[in-house]
């Protein structure tokens, strides 16, 4: 959807650029700046704005956390789009078996479906994060709607787990000038990620595992998915099958696992 909007905005800006050029020339304003230069100017602005919206680590809209300290052999596992049963419970089983703590960025709508799972996440020492209510494309929304979806998700998550989330991750990592500021106003620190392995493409458990292991580095925040937006019970078995091997290989390479908050704070992983 967002790519259609990008195309529409770009075509609109080209039309506006041509109109501005004609008006400017008609009134004798900046006569040397012809239609082509107006178009180029608007397109350059489009590129800058789109880069800021779609590049999760771009500082254009402010700084955002996307990795922990590089001087410590610690990493964080994060899971987006849950809870999604029975798969989130299977993720929790694997983490419990390996004695690893992780961070779950939850969708409010999914949290309403499976409140008991959120309680288990908290009881087993994992961290809760806010991933909005409905996984909408936030750059297409205004400040009021952004605040509403973040606050509503935090309310649902707190009711289910007894803990209000203190971290926020925008769906797809896409932001606009208001997203990070509003998230902080709502008590959530925005967090992106260091390593995404496109596990939602279902490339196979071996590929998912190898991509994670190959991309590991100190302070790495790993993005995986225990759900798929608001899809009803999407099958994420490939990711779950890869998870024990990911944890084992990371430990063999000397990495320890921490929740995102502990990783960013530089405190000892549990």
What name fits each language-model region?
Residues 213-264:
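Catalytic grooves of carbohydrate-active enzymes
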Residues 79-81, 106-108, 130-132, 170-172, ...:
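A cross-domain feature marking catalytic cores of carbohydrate-active enzymes
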Residues 1-77, 84-97, 114, 119, ...:
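N-terminal pre-catalytic segment of deacetylase/amide-hydrolase enzymes
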Residues 140-144, 202-204, 233-237:
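Short, solvent-exposed loop/turn segments at secondary-structure boundaries
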